[in-house]
């Protein structure tokens, strides 16, 4: 009776641990902050000097220049135009042949009945191996996502990051993007192609019924780990 009482908590603990491993979340690709940090407290305005152009009113934007992102908190629209094609083929053919012959030309007369015609030996062997392998991958990702400038590098390049979430019925999808962009690559419509973004990290995932269907059950994964085949 005591063994049965002790066995129940152990089984319950094992089931709880197994349930915790039922859904292993994938590792994120975008690991930087997705929004700009909060602005610093406003500084006291400078004393008016009578000029028409006041930097305090226009920020760090020059007077005769388009308003393009250059400060933390500005937004940039990324046009996703990712397309990759890769193919690889391998073929290997190897062969090897070998032979050896061992014999005694003459033996003493008194040993004729013992070893005569018994030391002639022929040994041969062969080995052949053929292997082929092919792999290919095609990926296409198009769309748009608006990001925020989260940092400005010393050379003027902008660190951008952003996220877009879409919830449909019981499922949700999200797109995350981060990278470094040159302000000179940004067009007049405040857009830039994803192919012109350095250190680009693009993440597209979903949560819902479809995501659960594509995930192997925890008990099946357990037996797959324990199976030697």
UniProtKB/Swiss-Prot annotation:
Membrane disposition: Lipid-anchor
Stated name of the protein: Flagellar L-ring protein
Covalent lipidation (N-palmitoyl cysteine), chain numbering: 21
Similarity comment: Belongs to the FlgH family.
Gene Ontology MF terms in the entry: cytoskeletal motor activity
Underlying gene: flgH
Subunit structure: The basal body constitutes a major portion of the flagellar organelle and consists of four rings (L,P,S, and M) mounted on a central rod.
GO term, biological process aspect, one: bacterial-type flagellum-dependent cell motility
Function: Assembles around the rod to form the L-ring and probably protects the motor/basal body from shearing forces during rotation.
Lipidation (S-diacylglycerol cysteine): 21
One cellular component term from this protein's GO annotations in UniProt: bacterial-type flagellum basal body, distal rod, L ring
Cellular location(s): Cell outer membrane; Bacterial flagellum basal body
UniProt KW keywords: Bacterial flagellum, Cell outer membrane, Lipoprotein, Membrane, Palmitate, Signal
One Pfam family in the UniProt entry: FlgH
Primary subcellular site in the record, as a coarse category: membrane
Superkingdom to which the source organism belongs: Bacteria
């Amino acid at each position: 009776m005591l063994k049965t009482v002790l066995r129940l908590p152990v089984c319950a603990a094992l089931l709880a641990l197994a349930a915790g491993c039922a859904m292993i979340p994938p590792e994120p690709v975008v690991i930087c902050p997705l929004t700009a940090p909060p602005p610093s407290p406003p500084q006291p305005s400078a004393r008016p000097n009578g000029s028409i152009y006041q930097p305090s009113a226009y920020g760090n934007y020059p007077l005769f220049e388009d308003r393009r992102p250059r400060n933390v908190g500005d937004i940039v629209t990324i046009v996703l135009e990712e397309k990759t094609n890769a193919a690889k083929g391998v073929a290997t053919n190897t062969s090897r042949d070998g032979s050896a012959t061992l014999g005694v030309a003459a033996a003493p007369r008194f040993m004729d009945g013992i070893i005569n015609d018994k030391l002639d030996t022929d040994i041969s062997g062969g080995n052949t191996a053929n292997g082929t392998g092919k792999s290919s991958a095609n990926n296409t990702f198009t769309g748009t996502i608006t990001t925020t400038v989260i940092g400005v590098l010393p050379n003027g390049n902008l660190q951008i990051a952003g996220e877009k979430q879409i919830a449909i019925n019981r499922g949700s999808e999200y797109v995350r993007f981060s990278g470094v962009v040159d302000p000179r690559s940004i067009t007049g419509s405040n857009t830039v192609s994803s192919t012109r973004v350095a250190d680009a990290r693009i993440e597209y995932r979903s949560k819902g019924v479809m995501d659960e269907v594509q995930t192997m059950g925890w008990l099946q994964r357990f037996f797959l780990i324990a199976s030697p085949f």
